[in-house]
Amino acid sequence: MFEKQKRVGLVVYLYYNRDARKVHKYGDVYYHSKKGRYLVMYVNQNDLEEKMKELQKLKFVKEAVASAFDEIDHQFVGNLHREAN
């Protein structure tokens, strides 16, 4: 049966927008900001390190950053009254 894969967001900063098509083979591109020259894409979590290394080796990629969505607190109720850690 089908098993759900854990996905992670990845932000890829480019030097030029014309190179955005070349990144499509590394994962599922969700958003392309032409003004900011970056792509938001999703890759499988078990392939994250490998994909980041491959992307950072490319000449047209300025930087590849993994999303910190899993690391932040998702309990928004009462954030103002909670003590800072």
UniProtKB/Swiss-Prot annotation:
One Pfam family per UniProt = DUF2129
InterPro entries the UniProt entry points to:
DUF2129
Task: Look up keyword Cytoplasm and say if it applies.
Answer: yes
Q: In which compartments does the protein localize?
A: Cytoplasm
**Location (main, coarse):** cytoplasm
Similarity comment: family membership: Belongs to the UPF0298 family.
Q: What is this protein called?
A: UPF0298 protein SUB0431
